[in-house]
Amino acid sequence: MKNAFKDTLKAGRPQIGLWLGLANSYSAELLAGAGFDWLLIDGEHAPNNVQTVLTQLQAIAPYPSQPVVRPSWNDPVQIKQLLDVGAQTLLIPMVQNADEARNAVAATRYPPAGIRGVGSALARASRWNRIPDYLHQANDAMCVLVQIETREAMSNLASILDVDGIDGVFIGPADLSADMGFAGNPQHPEVQAAIENAIVQIRAAGKAPGILMANEPLAKRYLELGALFVAVGVDTTLLARGAEALAARFGVEKNLSGASGVY
């Protein structure tokens, strides 16, 4: 068994990604052909569930782009289900300390190394027990990325980096800026200083730093500092802003007056 995303991180080669929030296998396949190294299937802020994650994994599978799946929480039950449908690389949100990082790793490993439940006969991940010796190979193929998104997590970064089985640490600029008192302003100098320091610290510890940043100069700056997995856009934003720009070129103005509410 191989995990190309994990192998590339270990080799120290940067990977450029795109965030998927449309929760749709058709758009996921469309974007899988765009050339990004990795695609993040978001279960935290997008309307995904295990079934929609499965269909997107199937849609991306024929393409070189590598899928990364973000569950809604650091929950071993949810993690087990995502691994069984074929996710190998997980991005665990809102990890605050080393204990939570250890819990995330344990949820991805079969016993005795962890607590992942054994159900390989039912699992796409094992090709329904068609992969020889899957139970003994699976642990090494798992890639665990944890998100640090608060001042508390930043203060615990050194101990998080010491946790065996953590392959990368992803800095969440939106939540971090809010926690630091600069909601909606991840480009504030204090936030940027925290991000840059974290990238350097993560890389120095032998782990892979990651981030989502649609601002192109900042994304390139993070890559220069040593970030190894950087998402540079979001599918919903590309679609919304692209459609708005096209409409504007023909003199069409946005009109939301008929919208009665969020429903």
Swiss-Prot record:
| Feature type site, description Transition state stabilizer | R70
Catalytic function, reaction form = 4-hydroxy-2-oxoheptanedioate = succinate semialdehyde + pyruvate
| Binding residue positions for substrate | Q147, A174, D175
Site note Increases basicity of active site His, residues = D84
User: How does the cofactor attach, per the note?
Assistant: Binds 1 divalent metal cation per subunit.
- Residues annotated for a divalent metal cation binding in this entry: E149, D175
Which GO molecular function annotations are given, in alphabetical order? 4-hydroxy-2-ketopimelate aldolase activity; metal ion binding
The Gene Ontology biological process annotation of the record reads:
4-hydroxyphenylacetate catabolic process; phenylacetate catabolic process
> Any idea which residues are catalytic in this one?
H45 (proton acceptor)
The domain of life is Bacteria
Cofactor requirement = a divalent metal cation
E.C. number = 4.1.2.52
Quote the pathway field.
Aromatic compound metabolism; 4-hydroxyphenylacetate degradation; pyruvate and succinate semialdehyde from 4-hydroxyphenylacetate: step 7/7
Q: Which GO terms describe its cellular component?
A: cytoplasm
Q: Which UniProt keywords apply?
A: Aromatic hydrocarbons catabolism, Lyase, Metal-binding
Q: Which N-terminal residues, if any, form the signal peptide?
A: none
Q: How does it assemble?
A: Homohexamer; trimer of dimers.
The family assignment reads:
Belongs to the HpcH/HpaI aldolase family.
The record describes the protein's role as: Catalyzes the reversible retro-aldol cleavage of 4-hydroxy-2-ketoheptane-1,7-dioate (HKHD) to pyruvate and succinic semialdehyde.
Protein name listed in UniProt: 4-hydroxy-2-oxo-heptane-1,7-dioate aldolase
Question: What is the source species?
Answer: Salmonella paratyphi C (strain RKS4594)
- Gene behind this chain? hpcH
